[in-house]
């Protein structure tokens, strides 16, 4: 999760987020080099006496400042398209989880398990335990297996919402009457926090998302326990 005064992105816990952070650093380095070059040229213009003010024809420099930006754009576009196609790959997901946005809470349905569904509300401040985070904790955490491809089906029952977990590199709009799809996976166990990222009304700030990734065998035990309890 984010920390106070953090300037960079959150630590990645999924392969997609690792690719996004690498692309972010790649694009930032290109921007830094361009900015340095422009600043250098501006400083030269302000400090150097111009001796060729009457030059009207410079084919070489015109070719350079036409071709060079095109090459830079290609260097940015190719990795961007690669990541875009990676986020749309769905190869035999282990589990399907449906997230439904409401004003102002989330509902979750495990499509592969019969009658396994629950609502997830924000935990009020006066119910927080020591070490829990204000405005980020929920009463029912979403438990998922780690190191598994999980297909998310995201929709809404009322207004526009957005299901976002930054450390997993997932941000998908929840639209009434439409079912959007996303893929997520975590390479390590732990708690990962997110929030609704679409202004959806007066309590938009009170729609946190908490994902708890655990080991396969522990997840099966958890799912079996919930199924027995629901009988």
Swiss-Prot record:
Protein name, entry field: Cytochrome c oxidase subunit 2
GO CC term, one of those recorded: respiratory chain complex IV
Similarity-based family: Belongs to the cytochrome c oxidase subunit 2 family.
Cofactor descriptive note: Binds a dinuclear copper A center per subunit.
Annotated binding of Cu cation A1, by residue: 161, 196, 200, 207
Enzyme class, first EC level, given as a word: translocase
PANTHER family reported in the protein's UniProt record: CYTOCHROME C OXIDASE SUBUNIT 2, CYTOCHROME C OXIDASE, SUBUNIT II
Side Mitochondrial intermembrane, residues: 1-14, 88-231
Named cofactor requirement(s): Cu cation
Record flagged with keyword Transport: yes
A GO BP entry: ATP synthesis coupled electron transport
Self-association state and partner proteins as the record states: Component of the cytochrome c oxidase (complex IV, CIV), a multisubunit enzyme composed of 14 subunits. The complex is composed of a catalytic core of 3 subunits MT-CO1, MT-CO2 and MT-CO3, encoded in the mitochondrial DNA, and 11 supernumerary subunits COX4I, COX5A, COX5B, COX6A, COX6B, COX6C, COX7A, COX7B, COX7C, COX8 and NDUFA4, which are encoded in the nuclear genome.
Organism expressing this protein natively: Aotus nigriceps
GO molecular function, one term: cytochrome-c oxidase activity
Cell location: Mitochondrion inner membrane
CDD domains, per database record: CcO_II_C
Function: Component of the cytochrome c oxidase, the last enzyme in the mitochondrial electron transport chain which drives oxidative phosphorylation. The respiratory chain contains 3 multisubunit complexes succinate dehydrogenase (complex II, CII), ubiquinol-cytochrome c oxidoreductase (cytochrome b-c1 complex, complex III, CIII) and cytochrome c oxidase (complex IV, CIV), that cooperate to transfer electrons derived from NADH and succinate to molecular oxygen, creating an electrochemical gradient over the inner membrane that drives transmembrane transport and the ATP synthase.
EC number: 7.1.1.9
List of residues binding Cu cation A2: 196, 198, 200, 204
